[in-house]
Regions:
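Active-site proximal beta-strand in glycosyltransferases
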Residues: 101-103, 114-136, 143-144, 165, ...
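Membrane-proximal helix-turn-helix segments that form the acceptor-binding/catalytic region
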Residues: 144-164
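Short hydrophobic beta-strand element within catalytic cores of glycosyltransferases
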Residues: 323-326
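Short alpha-helical donor nucleotide-sugar binding micro-motif in glycosyltransferases
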Residues: 285-286, 293-298
Length: 407
């Protein structure tokens, strides 16, 4: 019996060190794909030695897949003059990747797929409507400069999707209101974390590994670690976080920044100007296993974003037993309970510093098991399994109907 084919479209290479929740989610969908499915990924090449424009047999997280790199993208953590999404979409034209199921994690590439047959699903990871209205750096996203053009494109493309999944309840509701004729296709979907990678340690193990990290960084054994992980882009507002560290009047606290991006140089400059070089370590992009280790031993994870969906990194922190401090953005404030984190009502260095201080001084109020409990419903094996089960059921019904018609 033929297997149903799922083709995933996104502008990255899963074997390259890359930063971002979308990439992590796609990797998880591939890892936990049931054997009943054939999985394909249309992505990018990581260097000039890789063959471009041909299907290649590959393996990811123990799963055999077919991989099609559209073009070479050597560093997707830093944006170029021409947005990567534009390059990726342009490279899609003239090709046909028709499949039983097609998952798009950006809207724009689906322009090339308008006439393709098969069931298409759009995953919405951020609230684009909030992004286009956000104040601040105009380089945050291209569409902020041309919101009318984006919404015109959205109106053109949205009807082709059989399903529209959003990890942001407000965004899902807005899509239902904007497109009432397809409101039954729009649904909220839980983001998910891989609990085989992100899990808590015992208190003794945690303290021992924390001391080891402090020793490696030539810091006091009493150091309390604050972890930030994500792209250094305007959306994440790392400058706000650095200023919050300057406002945090707590000895033996140290910020770990795991990530890279276009604001890396600006962040380094801010650190130097505020005299924080001894209180902040920039780690750059790190492998997921190393990130998981940092989640397990940090005292608190911090999210300073201007806008979000439900960032995977928050689920990963909670699943590792680490409390979260966040600005009021996206789904994270709805996820956190009083014993798993703190939501800052104001996006200011002082407010963020006060929230960090609250968790650092009173860890007993944010026990590890409370954090793990908050993340538990989002475990990947359960969330991803349910999505695939629904897909397979629809595929079987469609094929049974086709066979019945033939007979």
């Amino acid at each position: 019996m033929r297997k149903p084919v799922l083709t995933i479209f996104y502008q990255f290479n899963p074997w390259q060190s890359t930063i971002g929740g979308i990439q992590t989610l796609i990797n998880t969908f591939i890892k936990y794909a049931p054997s009943e499915f054939e999985v394909r990924l249309v992505g990018t090449g990581c260097d000039r030695t890789q063959t471009i424009g041909k299907w290649q047999a590959a393996e990811l997280a123990g799963r055999e897949i077919s991989f099609f790199p559209l073009f070479t993208l050597e560093n997707d953590n830093v944006r170029s003059l021409i947005p990567t999404t534009v390059k990726y979409t342009a490279a899609m034209f003239g090709r046909c990747f028709t499949s039983d199921f097609m998952h798009f994690h950006r809207l724009e590439p689906s322009l090339a797929a308008l006439n393709w047959q098969g069931e298409k699903t759009l995953f919405i990871h951020n609230d684009i409507h909030t992004q286009t209205k956000a104040a601040g750096d105009k380089n945050a996203i291209l569409w902020r400069r041309f919101p009318a053009a984006y919404f015109a494109l959205e109106s053109l493309l949205v009807n082709q999707f059989s399903q529209i999944f959003s990890c942001n309840t407000d965004s899902a509701q807005l899509y239902r209101q904007r497109y009432p004729h397809i409101e039954d296709r729009v649904a909220y979907i839980k983001n998910s974390f891989d609990n085989e990678i992100f899990y808590p340690l015992s208190q003794e193990q945690r303290q021992a590994q924390r001391r080891e990290l402090a020793k490696m960084l030539n810091l006091s054994e009493e150091t309390r670690f604050i972890l930030f992980a994500g792209r250094l882009h305007p959306q994440k507002d790392p400058i706000l976080l650095v200023r919050a560290i300057a406002a945090l009047n707590e000895p033996h606290t140290h910020l770990l920044i795991a990530g890279d991006g276009e604001l890396a140089a600006a962040v380094r400059t801010e650190i130097a100007q505020l005299g924080l070089s001894s209180r902040v370590t920039m780690l750059g992009a790190i492998p997921i296993q190393e990130l998981a280790r940092l989640h397990r031993i940090s005292n608190v994870f911090v999210l300073s974003s201007a806008y979000e969906g439900l960032p995977l990194v928050v689920l990963e922190a909670l699943a590792s037993g680490t409390a979260v401090v966040t600005t009021r953005c996206g789904e994270t404030p709805k996820l956190l309970a009083a014993d798993s984190g703190v939501v800052c009502e104001q996006r200011s260095p002082e407010s963020l510093a006060a929230a960090l201080q609250q968790v650092i001084l009173h860890p007993e109020n944010y026990p590890s098991m409370s954090c793990v409990r908050a993340a538990h419903p989002y475990a990947a094996r359960t969330v991803v399994r349910d999505v695939y089960n629904d897909m397979f059921t629809r595929w079987e019904k469609q094929n049974f109907s086709a066979v019945s018609c033939i007979n």
